[in-house]
């Protein structure tokens, strides 16, 4: 099984390329946001604990997120691969993720870092805001989100580069062109793991 992380600034195409990986390879997509919402809706013990933090305006602790992911991935032993979206965002989260995967005899195999120039990110997000009506896709909020991403993610890029799993991918062009840049990376690792 391949464990794939997709990094990239807001508007870099992470969601779109995740969909391409699912379509091409049958991978399972795990989004921390979706996972939290599902646990809260199901009123599980973990979901109730998370709701308590959220309702008080606090971030859900890393340990709780990792516990939710652990619960989910333990059911995914027969999948071709997992795409992690929105996690990890910090070095402690990355370390916790490595420990969690190691419990199953797995590791982070591939980190895809979608690289898109800032001007193009802003243009994509502004266009997305017009289409989707998302209130967080305005220029002021976009710049703040890009700054937060740059500050939080730079250490992770170094972290995964040192582990020789980071692959920078040019994130400009059509959806298909970008997917064709990613495919050889994934194909190489699929051959090695089979």
Curated annotation (Swiss-Prot):
Entry EC no(s): 2.7.4.3
Residues involved in AMP binding: 32, 37, 58-60, 86-89, 93, 134, 145
Spans annotated as LID: 127-137
Pathway(s) this gene product operates in, as recorded in its UniProt entry: Purine metabolism; AMP biosynthesis via salvage pathway; AMP from ADP: step 1/1
GO CC terms: cytoplasm
Binding residues annotated for ATP, in chain numbering: 11-16, 128, 173
Localization terms from the record: Cytoplasm
Transmembrane segments: none
Gene3D superfamilies linked to this entry: P-loop containing nucleotide triphosphate hydrolases
Region (NMP): 31-60
Catalytic activity annotation: AMP + ATP = 2 ADP
Keyword Amino-acid biosynthesis: no
GO biological process: AMP salvage
Pfam families the UniProt entry points to: ADK (PF00406)
Predominant location: cytoplasm
Keywords annotated in UniProt: ATP-binding, Cytoplasm, Kinase, Nucleotide biosynthesis, Nucleotide-binding, Transferase
NCBIfam families in alphabetical order: PRK00279.1-3 (NF001381), PRK14527.1 (NF011100), PRK14531.1 (NF011104), PRK14532.1 (NF011105)
Reported function: Catalyzes the reversible transfer of the terminal phosphate group between ATP and AMP. Plays an important role in cellular energy homeostasis and in adenine nucleotide metabolism.
Domain notes: Consists of three domains, a large central CORE domain and two small peripheral domains, NMPbind and LID, which undergo movements during catalysis. The LID domain closes over the site of phosphoryl transfer upon ATP binding. Assembling and dissambling the active center during each catalytic cycle provides an effective means to prevent ATP hydrolysis.
Subunit structure: Monomer.
Family: Belongs to the adenylate kinase family.
Identification of the protein by name: Adenylate kinase
């Amino acid at each position: 099984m391949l464990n794939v992380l997709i990094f990239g600034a807001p508007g870099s195409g992470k969601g779109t390329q995740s969909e391409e990986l699912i379509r091409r390879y049958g991978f399972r997509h795990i989004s921390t946001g979706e996972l939290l919402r599902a646990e809260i809706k199901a009123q599980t013990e973990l979901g109730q604990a998370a709701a308590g933090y959220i309702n008080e305006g606090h971030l859900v602790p890393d340990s709780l997120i990792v516990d939710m992911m652990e619960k989910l991935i333990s059911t995914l032993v027969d999948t071709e691969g997992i795409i992690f979206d929105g996690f990890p965002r910090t070095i402690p989260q990355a370390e916790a993720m490595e420990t969690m995967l190691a419990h199953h005899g797995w590791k982070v195999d591939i980190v895809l870092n979608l690289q898109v120039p800032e001007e193009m990110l802003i243009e994509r997000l502004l266009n997305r805001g017009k289409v989707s009506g998302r209130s967080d896709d305005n220029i002021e909020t976009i710049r703040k989100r890009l700054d937060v991403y740059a500050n939080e993610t730079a250490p992770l890029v170094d972290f995964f580069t040192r582990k020789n799993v980071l692959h920078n991918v040019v994130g400009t062009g059509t959806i298909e062109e970008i997917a064709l840049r990613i495919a050889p990376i994934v194909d190489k690792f699929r051959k090695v793991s089979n």
